[in-house]
């Protein structure tokens, strides 16, 4: 962090294995059959994955870049896309799960100081900007930070025989449902200010 904003603008971090453990058994089973498709790259990630080093199941969904969610239909060799209402509900449930972690002990809001340097494991820790981080510099103050991402050595296979990516800019291979390409993906909450 070169310069933190004068009026907040921290980052919320959540331990994704602990978040998965907080889910009920029916939701764990359902979410384990879901895979998200990145709105810009078409990369497919399982909503629930096993951490390659820790061996714990963790939940993962990018609220700002998801273009589609594919469901493996239980007991069948078939897939379908979530429709708009289902994807909105899923995103709200995931967002609520992250927020619940603030009181349940698996999420934290970190406010930056100058010269802070943080490292996180993206396979086990979710992060998102606090709402005030999207305020204008006139309201929040100017924040200057550098971010770097290290390419991982473990790929998250989507499972169920799905390919590692789809051409998100072509028509959906799954028929009806949300299939949104580009920008910040599917807008699940019109009130949520998003910037990527």
Regions found by a protein language model. Give the residues of each.
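Non-heme Fe(II) oxygenase catalytic core, chiefly the N-lobe of the double-stranded beta-helix
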Residues: 1-116, 123-196
